């Protein structure tokens, strides 16, 4: 589906055995309505992946570095509670991802979407470049830049209908 999940309707999509929503529900405001639609579309199973609690370490630390308020997405337990209140008793699994994110350059690290460059002014972007230069180190095997603070952390929420 090539549109935002919060904009889909059951009437235009119809029934499917499985609905998979990977990394597409973080930050959606009408989350309960979106979950109801997803649940209605699915005949057998729903699988959702969300950012886990460790996913935002580097962003949180950067905001502290520039003394800016951190505004994180609601954590996965928020969605779990909404599902529970809807009568859906979902399974939760934290996916064990071992690799750190790697970047070919500071620019790539800045532009990966994690830092929301569109919300930073020029001074904050310069501070971000400085911050990344301080914390990123080169992987001797791959030659790419990484930090232990920037590791993917994913939560799988699923249920059987």
How would you name each of these model-derived features?
Residues 37-38:
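Class I S-adenosylmethionine-dependent transferase superfamily signal
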Residues 60-84, 86-161:
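Conserved Class I S-adenosyl-L-methionine
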Residues 42-59:
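Conserved beta-strand signature within the Rossmann-like core of class I S-adenosyl-L-methionine
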Residues 33, 48, 66-70:
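Alpha-helical subdomain
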Residues 1-3:
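Hydrophobic/aromatic anchor residues within beta-strands of the central parallel beta-sheet
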């Amino acid at each position: 589906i090539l549109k935002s999940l919060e904009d889909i309707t059951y009437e235009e999509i119809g029934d499917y055995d499985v609905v998979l929503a990977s990394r597409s529900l973080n930050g959606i405001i009408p989350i309960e309505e979106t979950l109801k639609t997803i649940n209605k579309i699915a005949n057998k199973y729903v699988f959702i992946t969300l950012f886990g609690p460790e996913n935002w370490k580097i962003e949180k630390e950067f905001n502290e570095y520039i003394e800016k308020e951190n505004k994180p997405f609601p954590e996965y337990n928020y969605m779990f509670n909404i599902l529970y209140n809807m009568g859906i008793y979902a399974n939760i699994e934290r996916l064990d991802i071992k690799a750190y994110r790697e970047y070919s350059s500071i620019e790539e690290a800045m532009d990966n979407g994690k830092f929301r460059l569109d919300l930073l002014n020029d001074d904050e972007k310069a501070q971000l470049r400085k911050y990344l230069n301080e914390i990123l180190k080169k992987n001797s095997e791959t030659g790419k830049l990484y930090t232990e603070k920037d590791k993917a952390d994913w939560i799988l929420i699923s249920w059987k209908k």
